[in-house]
Amino acid sequence: MSKNPDLKGSSFTLSVLHLSDNQIAHTVQFLQEKIAQAPAFFANAPVVINVAKVEGDIDYPALKQGISQAGLIPVGVTGCKDKRSQNLAVEAGFAVMTATNSPAQAPAQMAPTKVIRTPVRSGQQIYAKDGDLVILSHVSAGAEVIADGSIHIYGTLRGRAIAGASGQREARIICHDLQAELISIAGRYWLSDQIESQFWQQRVMLSMTDESLYLETLTI
């Protein structure tokens, strides 16, 4: 006997594209350039579009088509200023989303730390579910290391490191030599060109402060 499906609420960490104007071509070009820098990270990733700062009408069908052609999946719009803007978004196939402050939840039971003693090669992906990840070697360009907790890399990070993958904003990324393609905590990320030169090839720690990423050098 088949069982009925169950519909429950849940929460997810999604990338948010903040528009500053209604110039769709410029937005699509920006996305294409960013995705080209880390295609594996962005491939078929869901994205929410924040239109709170946009003045004037938005060509929502063109926006949706452009985002899709860039390789992302547009799932919704937030920040609509009036009902008309909401209706235009819905007609184009967007969900209209409202940001809310969720009540604090008890932290999940953390799993034992996952330790990798060998180099992480290009094309490999290592994931520490519900726990921290320790890499005792290097992470090559094209490799990806992910943890729901923090990530410690006792070598060079040339690939991508994604900590707090399930939304844990207290997560950290610590590495002995930063040359990353991408670093991310709880959905916030920097590509290589966003990392200030003073931190390049240095021993560093990445954390989140007031919803923004914060990078500092370590002297120990």
From Swiss-Prot:
This is Probable septum site-determining protein MinC. GO terms for biological process: cell morphogenesis; division septum assembly; regulation of cell division; regulation of cell septum assembly. HAMAP family: MinC. The keyword Cell division applies. Interacts with MinD and FtsZ. Belongs to the MinC family. It comes from Vibrio cholerae serotype O1 (strain ATCC 39315 / El Tor Inaba N16961). It comes from the Bacteria. Cell division inhibitor that blocks the formation of polar Z ring septums. Rapidly oscillates between the poles of the cell to destabilize FtsZ filaments that have formed before they mature into polar Z rings. Prevents FtsZ polymerization. InterPro entries: CAP/MinC_C, MinC, MinC_C_sf, MinC_N, Septum_form_inhib_MinC_C. Signal peptide: none annotated. Gene3D superfamilies: 2.160.20.70, 3.30.70.260. Keywords: Cell cycle, Cell division, Septation. Pfam families: MinC_C (PF03775), MinC_N (PF05209).
